[in-house]
Each structure stands twice: as C-alpha cells, then as structure tokens.
A protein has these predicted regions:
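Glycine-rich, phosphate-binding/catalytic loops in enzymes
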Residues: 70-72
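Short S/T/G/P-rich N-terminal loop/turn motif that feeds into the first structured element of a domain
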Residues: 1-50, 59-68, 77-104
Length: 104
C-alpha cells in the first residue's frame, strides 16, 4: 500500500463551508476508483491550503489517476497546482473496522 498526500496553496483563503462544498462536488470522481482504498479531504486551519490523503493499493493505481488531466482539473477548480508526497504504508490500523491490515 502507498499513501499520497496531495496539497496545494489557494490564491485566497476559503472557509470550511466552502471547502466542504468543493470537496463534496469532487468526491464522486473518487468513488469506486480502482486501487483507491480510502480518501480524506483536508483544509488547513487558516484556509490557505487544501488537499487530501489517499490510501492506495499501489503507486501504479494512484499514478493512473494523478495524470496531467487530473492536475489540469485541480488547477481549474482551485487555481493552484497540486504537490504530491508519497509514503510507503506497510501497516494500517482501522479502529472503525476493528482490524489491522498489513501490506502484501
């Protein structure tokens, strides 16, 4: 498994309500994506940065989504270019499901 942390600075701060509205509008694009295990949307407390943390089955699955077209869509929607940081994710603790998952 791999975790992608995507962040981008906004041209101007947005409220939590506006961030939630924008996130809700893009969320259906990520539903049932091959290889995506979980996605969390993020907004900094000052509203100047937004992004997401996504847990993927593999980097290959993530890179199939984070294409030039995806970057252009983010740029158009938020007015900023996304930055992606990659992290190997060998173990996940899921208290909601009551399980610990180890990467294959």
């Amino acid at each position: 498994m791999i975790t992608a942390i995507v962040q981008f600075a906004l041209p101007s701060p947005i409220s939590l309500e506006e961030a939630a509205r924008r996130f809700q509008s893009s969320a259906p694009n990520y539903k049932n994506l091959p290889g995506l295990i979980r996605k969390f949307y993020l907004r900094s407390e000052d509203g100047r940065r937004v992004g997401g943390v996504s847990l993927w089955e593999s980097r290959q699955a993530a890179e199939a989504v984070y294409t030039g077209e995806w970057r252009a869509r983010v740029q158009q929607h938020y007015g900023s270019t996304p930055e992606i940081a990659w992290f190997d994710t060998p173990v996940v603790v899921d208290n909601g499901a009551g399980k610990i998952t180890k990467a294959a």
